[in-house]
């Protein structure tokens, strides 16, 4: 590790998003330095640690690993700093006059006797105080940076901590460093716990136990749970904190009193919710029950009215060339009769035909319809299937970005105060919708609006917490129409036929003689790799007339030789190998390359995107990229340390390198992440794994993602065991219970 000391002569480049800075440092020689600095000005004196590196384009650079600011030790250094622009309102000329008047005593005068600055022509008493205030703030920030770096906190995070707490940060860290996990994005319980250990906070601190309990609930929500039974919560938190279960149990009442948790009695056990999760379920239940009670103009249909509706349905069938079965006709009738309707059914059962008939019926009544789906891909499919514009739920609700300078968080413009101006709202792929998005949707639905929710309850539940569609059906409060008949055209597809057989637990003929459902028995990982590459690179693109990039590998697991992480490395080298014209960058454990297929792996409501014309002119812009959105890396800018990704609908997002931790390669993705998407061809490697994961539900979801053909590579026994395995990971949710409780009160 090399040490340097000098002053900054020139800021060459600064990325305001991540603090990445390129600057010239005068040490006697001019040295180009690169590192992360959130507040660096020309004239600053720095002590650096790092290493010299050789950049392929920009030559020799000093890569900074740590630094600290130094105060100028002579009058020349003070003048250089004051005149650099670091202090607003002080230029080179005024800096020279200040230093000429006070010499090497300048900084002491500013700190201890700032009123004396007014002795200089051009400086009023007010300006003198402003200069002193700016100097004090910069001094405080630098002291804080040094203090935080001592505990291993990165420069970027240190700045955010200082901006959040100011001079209070010392008291917060000494008393309760776990507060950082609540207040600052990017600091979770584990990072706060590491910091607390360095500071010397006792492992049995009340703050640590409470924060650990809340983290356990938050972590459980990542598994889809809305709550945990008390016994499960205590056991998990005790294991996390390495403390006796009694210590955990003692803190639960305190968290309840502080309104951090809601605890409900459940027989001999309890049910423990994070406060916001309990009220999210309760709010959804209340809004649904209120919508369900809304009297529509039709009210209770008389026989003559019902006959008139069905006659209109017959006319639509003739006009559109459709043939509805009795359940489909019933669905249309129920959509007219009720304010809420749930329409469910597997592939090939006519959900799209039913939706189209409902749309045509309400169009004929002169009503305004909104169509939506959880993802861009699902919305695009809905548009293509109906001929009616469908949007993502986020776009329909008009997501607006955060404004940190005003404290405004990302939010939806459409809400209870500004509801959607629609008579009918149809939402497809409801199995993907988690409790938080559903709550936001319901807030924007005004009384009198019909809400029609469509989905396949046999799909995997949402990635986020809750199992909204399943709970709505289980409540038995709302009208549900479950389509069951497989129509003739769908019967010609083995994908559809086999998917329905899976649901019934029926074994299928595993052969490669179908037109769209192939099984290739391959019982070793290297052989599966070889055939997967052949299928993607040569065979399937010709068979389904699609690009290799459109063919999706779906796997149950993240880890292991047939998990997402390993498969992506294998497929990247095949589909997007390195070449002289492609830039690449290693970020963490992932090598990203221009041309890579990637996926956003968490909701980010702050990310800004834009759509540009072929001439580079912005024609649309917005905020928000969401868990499961897939795109292509178009450009890697090594100098700016940014990555440009283009998503569906030509939305372009520029990520800083640190932000790329929210992105991963997507040549292979988990079956769970594929929900709501459809691909020309799907390849599923299945060679064994945990029984709870390798189940019928997972196989069904993966197979039904394929539009043209699905190919399973692996073990015959594993596929047969998955078909027979009904077990699913239970989700702890209670939306159905809340609905029934409120319906009983109504």
Protein language model features and the residues they cover:
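P-loop (Walker A) phosphate-binding loop of NTP-binding proteins
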Residues: 346, 374
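Accessory, non-ATPase domains that flank or precede helicase/AAA+ motor cores in DNA-metabolism machines
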Residues: 1-301, 309, 746
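Conserved lysine of the Walker
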Residues: 351
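C-terminal accessory regions
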Residues: 620-622, 627-746
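Hydrophobic anchor at the beta1->P-loop junction of P-loop NTPases
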Residues: 343, 371
């Amino acid at each position: 590790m090399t040490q340097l000391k000098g002053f900054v002569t020139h800021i060459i480049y600064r990325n305001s998003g991540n603090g990445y800075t390129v600057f010239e440092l005068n040490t006697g020689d001019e040295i180009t330095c690169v590192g992360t600095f959130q507040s660096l000005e020309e004239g600053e004196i720095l002590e650096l640690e790092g290493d010299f590196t050789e950049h392929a384009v920009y030559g020799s650079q000093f890569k900074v690993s740590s630094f600290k600011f130094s105060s100028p030790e002579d009058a020349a250094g003070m003048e250089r700093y004051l005149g650099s622009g670091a202090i607003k309102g002080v230029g080179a000329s005024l800096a020279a006059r200040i230093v000429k008047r006070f010499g090497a005593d300048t900084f002491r005068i500013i700190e201890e006797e700032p009123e004396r600055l007014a002795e200089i022509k051009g400086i009023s008493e007010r300006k003198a105080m402003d200069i002193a205030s700016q100097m004090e703030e910069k001094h405080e920030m630098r002291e804080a940076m040094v203090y935080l770096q001592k505990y291993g906190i990165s420069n970027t995070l240190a700045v955010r901590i200082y901006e959040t707490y100011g001079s209070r940060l010392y008291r917060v860290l000494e008393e309760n460093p776990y507060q950082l996990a609540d207040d600052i994005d990017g600091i979770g319980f584990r990072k706060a716990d590491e910091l607390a250990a360095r500071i010397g906070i006792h492992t049995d601190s009340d703050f640590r136990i409470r924060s650990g309990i809340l983290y356990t609930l938050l972590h459980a929500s990542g598994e889809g749970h809305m709550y945990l039974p008390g016994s499960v919560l205590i056991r998990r938190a005790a294991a996390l904190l390495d403390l006796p279960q009694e210590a955990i149990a003692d803190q639960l009442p305190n968290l309840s009193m502080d309104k951090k948790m809601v605890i409900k009695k459940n027989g001999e056990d309890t049910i423990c919710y994070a406060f916001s999760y309990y009220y999210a379920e309760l709010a959804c239940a209340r809004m649904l029950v209120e919508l369900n009670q809304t009297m529509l103009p039709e009210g209770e249909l008389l026989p003559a009215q019902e006959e008139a509706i069905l006659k209109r349905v017959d006319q639509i069938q003739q006009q559109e060339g459709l043939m509805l079965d009795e359940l489909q006709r019933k669905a249309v009738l129920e959509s007219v009769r009720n304010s809420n309707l749930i329409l469910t059914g597997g592939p090939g059962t006519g959900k799209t035909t039913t939706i189209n008939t409902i749309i045509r019926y309400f169009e004929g009544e002169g009503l305004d319809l909104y169509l939506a789906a959880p993802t861009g891909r699902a919305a695009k499919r809905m548009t293509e299937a109906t001929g009616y514009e469908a949007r993502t739920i986020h776009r329909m609700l008009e997501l607006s970005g955060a404004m940190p300078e005003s404290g405004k968080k990302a939010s939806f413009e459409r809400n209870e105060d500004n509801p959607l101006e629609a008579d009918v709202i149809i939402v497809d792929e409801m199995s993907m919708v988690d409790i938080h998005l559903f709550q936001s949707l319901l807030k924007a639905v005004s009384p009198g609006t019909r809400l029609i929710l469509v989905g396949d309850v046999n799909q995997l539940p949402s990635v986020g917490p809750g199992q909204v569609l399943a709970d709505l059906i289980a409540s038995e409060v709302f009208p549900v129409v479950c389509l069951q008949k497989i129509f003739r055209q769908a019967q010609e597809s083995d994908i559809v036929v086999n998917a329905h057989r899976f649901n019934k637990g029926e074994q299928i003929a595993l052969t490669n003689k179908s037109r769209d459902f192939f099984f290739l028995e391959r019982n070793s990982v290297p052989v599966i790799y070889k055939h997967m590459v052949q299928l993607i690179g040569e065979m399937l693109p010709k068979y389904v007339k699609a690009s290799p990039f459109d063919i999706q590998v779906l796997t149950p697991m993240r880890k292991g030789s047939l998990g997402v992480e390993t498969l992506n490395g294998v497929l990247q080298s095949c589909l997007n190998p390195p070449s002289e014209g492609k830039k690449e960058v290693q970020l963490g454990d992932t090598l990203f390359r221009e041309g890579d297929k990637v996926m956003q792996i968490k909701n980010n409501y702050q990310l800004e995107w834009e759509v540009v014309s072929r001439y580079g002119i912005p024609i649309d812009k917005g905020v928000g990229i969401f868990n499961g959105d897939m795109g292509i890396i178009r450009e890697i800018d090594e100098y700016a340390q940014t990555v440009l990704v283009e998503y569906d609908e030509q939305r372009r997002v520029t990520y800083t390198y640190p932000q790329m931790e929210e992105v991963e390669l997507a040549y292979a993705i988990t079956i769970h992440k594929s929900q709501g998407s459809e691909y020309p061809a799907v390849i599923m490697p299945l060679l064994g794994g945990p029984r709870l994961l390798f189940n019928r539900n997972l196989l069904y979801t993966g197979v039904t993602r394929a539009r043209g053909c699905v190919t399973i590579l692996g073990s015959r026994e594993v596929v047969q065991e998955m078909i027979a395995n009904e077990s699913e990971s239970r989700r702890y949710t209670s939306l159905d219970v809340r609905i029934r409780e409120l319906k009983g009160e109504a």
